[in-house]
């Protein structure tokens, strides 16, 4: 009997410092969307692969344009895109709306899927000028882009390499107090990401200021020294599928559900 072969997973594109060839139809669509947002005065910032490229020089093939907006501005953007004939959908009201034509699409992102991190006006006001596909626009500041990737830790997608590349490229110029402000009580994820960076780039430890390392390590030693066995389980905030057994079978708390329900109560209606 022939052994059944497992289906092949789609190949993952390699990162490169050389520009990727983008179909003109895709460029045109992205330019149209950015021009529409400018015309309608929708406050946004480009994120994703295009923002990563701006901060690190790394090019990656992508069929989508990621735009970060506050929930209120995402609702406006979706309305304007519908008026322009885009097919629009609310994928997840907590964080993601999509507008597409053919195989190319725009992601309107208002936060992280676990609802821990939410895009606020300050994210947009701190965005920096850039030119994307020949169009003057703004990309997320490095601090916000880095923090937006901290919770992308799922089994099927991990943004640790992006974070490591960002720290390598701009770590010495980062506004670290702003990073600490954004991560708040989830600072241990930042420590985890920086230890990952240190493993990848052991000779570039200086990209993270000594006082940042010391601050995080002292805080970590403090919480380890007074560990509370009643501290709530946070695995579902990382990956609800991989930690489903903890919640469903072992009776651990479902913080993901709590965060998302709390967030849903504050989201504007999008029609």
For the regions a language model picked out, list residue spans one by one.
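Compositionally biased terminal segments of proteins
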Residues: 1-271
């Amino acid at each position: 009997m022939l052994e059944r072969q497992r289906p092949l997973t789609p190949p993952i594109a390699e990162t490169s410092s050389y520009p990727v060839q983008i179909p003109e139809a895709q460029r045109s669509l992205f330019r149209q969307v950015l021009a529409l947002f400018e015309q309608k005065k929708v406050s946004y910032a480009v994120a994703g692969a295009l923002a990563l490229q701006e901060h690190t020089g790394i090019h990656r093939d992508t069929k989508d344009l990621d735009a970060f907006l506050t929930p209120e501005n995402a609702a406006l953007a979706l309305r304007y895109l519908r008026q322009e004939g885009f097919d629009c959908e609310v994928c997840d009201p907590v964080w993601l709306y999509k507008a597409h034509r053919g195989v190319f699409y725009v992601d309107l992102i208002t936060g992280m899927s676990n609802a821990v991190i939410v895009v606020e006006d300050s994210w947009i006001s701190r965005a920096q000028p850039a030119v994307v596909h020949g169009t003057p626009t703004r990309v997320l500041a490095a601090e916000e882009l880095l923090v937006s990737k901290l919770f992308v830790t799922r089994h099927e997608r991990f943004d640790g390499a992006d974070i490591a590349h960002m720290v390598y490229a701009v770590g010495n110029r980062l506004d670290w107090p702003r990073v600490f402000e954004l991560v708040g009580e989830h600072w241990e994820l930042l420590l985890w990401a920086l230890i990952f960076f240190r493993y990848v780039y052991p000779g570039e430890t200086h990209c993270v200021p000594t006082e940042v390392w010391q601050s995080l390590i002292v805080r970590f030693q403090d919480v380890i020294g007074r560990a509370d066995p009643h501290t709530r389980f946070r695995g579902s905030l990382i990956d609800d599928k991989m930690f489903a057994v903890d919640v469903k079978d072992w009776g651990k708390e479902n913080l993901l559900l709590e965060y998302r329900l709390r967030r849903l109560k504050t989201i504007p209606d999008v029609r």
